[in-house]
Each structure stands twice: as structure tokens, then as C-alpha cells.
Regions:
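Structured binding/interaction patches within domain cores
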Residues: 1-148
Length: 148
């Protein structure tokens, strides 16, 4: 089934196991990693891809990604530095990747939305406006996952 809207996208993500959601969340976040150079964020996304990740690792990585999110938010400034804002949303997407299953009902959806926000901020920063193809790329990634 081709997914071409957010209602179907969110519903399909919600049917996945937490492990599957974590894998997709990492994929969604990986697509925007070029917008954030923070090693804490990269480490969280990389670790989220591991099927054997422990709850202790998840908690530590969540705190690291949260610290990166707070640091990047502080860099945005009063005038909204859009590139820094993009990095902030990448860090938030990474937080979703390593969030406790009890803290989120749909990890992949949360990461997808933050990744879209990151891409939107980046396109504003470069003067391209708010149109981008991040949602379409996410729909395709989910379809690929479903077809395995």
C-alpha cells in the first residue's frame, strides 16, 4: 500500500513494534544528520540502530541527546538563527530515537516530525522557503521497511 499522507503514515508507524519504530526513527533522523554536527546526536542515532541496545544505554544516550538539544536551542538566539534551529530539531529527533518506550507512544512519528522541522529550518536558512521533500522521503522509507 502506497503511503501518501500523514494520517496513513502515522497509523502505519503506530502498528510497528518499539524496535521497528526505533529503527525507522534512526533512519528518519539519519536523513537530516547533515544539519547537526554534534557527536552526541550522531552517537544516539547510531546506537538506536542496534537491536541489542539496553535500557541503560538508551537512558544515557537520551540524556546526551537532550543536552545537545538544549545547547543548540540556546544557540538559536533571539533572532532565530535558522541553521542552529535545524540542529536543535535534529537533536530532538535523536531524542525520540532513544526515548524510553514508556515515554512515547510513537517514537518514529516523533522523530519524523522533528526531522521535518529540521529540514524546514534548513531550507529557510538557505532562502529556499518552506517547501521540501522530507515527508515523501519518510513515506518511502516506511514503505521499504514494510516490504522487507
Amino acid at each position: 500500500m502506497a503511503i501518501d499522507n500523514d494520517t496513513d503514515f502515522k497509523a502505519a508507524l503506530g502498528k510497528l513494534s518499539v524496535a521497528q519504530q526505533r529503527q525507522l526513527a534512526a533512519g528518519f533522523t539519519n536523513n537530516v544528520m547533515g544539519l547537526c554536527q554534534d557527536v552526541r546526536v550522531a552517537g544516539a542515532v547510531s546506537a538506536a540502530k542496534r537491536p541489542d541496545i539496553t535500557d541503560i544505554e538508551l537512558a544515557a544516550l537520551y540524556q546526551a541527546a537532550k543536552s545537545a538539544s538544549i545547547d543548540s536551542y540556546a544557540q538559536c538566539g533571539q533572532d532565530t538563527e535558522w541553521s542552529a534551529q535545524a540542529g536543535h530539531f535534529v537533536a530532538k529527533a535523536a531524542m525520540a530515537c532513544v526515548a524510553s518506550a514508556a515515554d512515547s507512544t510513537n517514537l518514529a512519528w516523533d522523530a519524523a516530525m522533528d526531522a521535518r522541522m529540521a529540514r524546514t529550518c534548513a531550507t529557510i536558512a538557505t532562502g529556499e522557503g518552506t517547501a521540501n521533500r522530507e515527508a515523501d522521503a519518510q513515506y518511502q522509507l516506511l514503505e521499504q521497511h514494510q516490504n522487507r
